[in-house]
């Protein structure tokens, strides 16, 4: 089955693409290569197992050049919290307007299945176990952009009968992680591999949830 994967050349997206191929699907990769890397998917494209379009999801006209597929997996986003602080308008354009463009693309192409990549960041500084009904309190522009994306997804589901799932992954780690956005596990491993002790801030008692990129990739195929 052909499946559009936005952000498919990125850290998580390239793993989703790889898993789709292993499950006999044909990914249509959409990426503007702002943070994604073509080398992550080149072997799949060269071997004819995937197709690549260098398209920015903010460009509605170019999006309409994409083929109709049974489903869309939407990962394309600015994932840096720091960038959302420094350049909130840009992050809003990509994460909010870009998501709206993808939903509208699906409506126009009559694509009913849509998976949106949200974030556990929408819960804010929540210090207890969270679930689907936990109150959302976003405290960054990035988190707010993801929650807004979820709200647009609900509207399109209600109005147009789209079958939409929103995933809320927490801190993802694993191969191909962008050095600029590397999480604490990557930074710990980099220092340990160079025979330096990891840098631990505070008293070391803070906790954080992590998930390996292979596990989150599987979640998109459930």
Question: What role is predicted for each listed range?
Answer:
Residues 128, 151-208, 213-222:
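NAD(P)-dependent short-chain dehydrogenase/reductase
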């Amino acid at each position: 089955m052909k499946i559009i994967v936005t952000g498919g050349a990125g850290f998580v997206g390239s793993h989703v693409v790889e898993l789709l191929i292993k499950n006999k699907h044909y990914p249509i990769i959409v990426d503007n290569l702002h943070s994604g890397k073509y080398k992550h998917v080149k072997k799949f494209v060269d071997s004819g197992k995937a197709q690549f379009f260098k398209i920015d999801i903010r460009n509605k006209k170019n999006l309409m050049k994409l083929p109709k597929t049974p489903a869309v997996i939407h990962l394309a986003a600015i994932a840096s919290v720091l960038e959302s602080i420094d350049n909130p308008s840009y992050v809003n354009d990509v994460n909010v307007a870009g998501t709206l463009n993808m939903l509208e693309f699906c409506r126009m192409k009559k694509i009913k299945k849509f998976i949106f990549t949200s974030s556990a960041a929408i819960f804010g500084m929540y210090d207890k176990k969270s679930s689907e009904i936990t109150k959302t309190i976003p405290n960054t522009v990035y988190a707010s952009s993801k929650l807004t994306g979820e709200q647009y997804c609900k509207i399109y589901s209600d109005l147009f009968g789209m079958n939409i799932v929103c995933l809320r992954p927490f801190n993802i780690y694993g191969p191909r992680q962008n050095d600029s956005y590397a999480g604490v596990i990557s930074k710990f491993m980099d220092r340990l591999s160079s025979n330096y002790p990891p840098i631990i801030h505070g008293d070391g008692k803070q906790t954080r949830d992590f998930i390996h990129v292979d596990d989150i990739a599987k979640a998109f195929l459930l």
